[in-house]
Amino acid sequence: SALGLAPDLVFSIIEENKIKCDPKRNGTLHCAHSEKGMEYLIERFKQGELFKEPLTLFDKTETDNKVGSSKFFGSLHDSRAGTIQPLAYCRGLARKAKELGAKIYEKSKVSQVKKQNGIWKTYVRVIEIKSKYLLLAMNAYQDLDKSHNMGKFSTVHYSQFATRPLNSNEMSTILPGKEGCWDTAAIMSSLRVDDAGRLI
């Protein structure tokens, strides 16, 4: 599937373009925050087996040892995936795009977008920019009218915190395998350890 192939694509882009973004490809742990969450992971595991995906289902004890927390009911490990520093990855992509001739404009607020005869027209003040493709990647900072976003945006409240660098004892017990980790809760929590040894 496209989702299953995505890590190969991302990590190959990082390697080919020498993007410095703390890449770690040690897999990810999807952790069950409840018994119902564990049922969901078991179902995902069974589906993955049908497609011969490299998934491993861990019970509570194994998950406790891999995460360093006793709060989870189990987890699903996907060895294809990993973690990156997303802003550094984005900057690396921008650098490569510039090397290939792309022009990047900052502080260039788009006032209008329309499509005519298969061509996108984007307006910045009095300037019209024509393109074959248009990627709407405005995050929360967009004020185009509803006809432009066509209901494609969802509000996601998310924040990240970083601890002080973990000491050697903590490093040996909190995500010792350096996997990325997130849970099955509707309001998701995620964990990873960065190159500075901080828990993010």
PLM regions: where:
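General beta-strand structural signal in soluble alpha/beta enzymes
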Residues: 56-59, 104-106, 136, 182
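Helical element adjacent to the flavin cofactor pocket in flavoenzyme catalytic cores
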Residues: 39-49, 70-133, 137
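A broad, structure-centric signal for solvent-exposed, well-ordered loop/edge residues
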Residues: 28, 38, 65, 70, ...
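Active-site substrate-recognition segment that forms the wall
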Residues: 8-24, 110-112, 120, 128-200
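Flavin (FAD/FMN) cofactor-binding and adjacent substrate-gating region
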Residues: 1, 9-92
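A generic, residue-level signal for flexible/boundary positions that often mark functional hotspots
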Residues: 15-17, 49-52, 78, 98, ...
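Residues in well-ordered beta-strands of folded domains
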Residues: 32, 77, 123, 162, ...
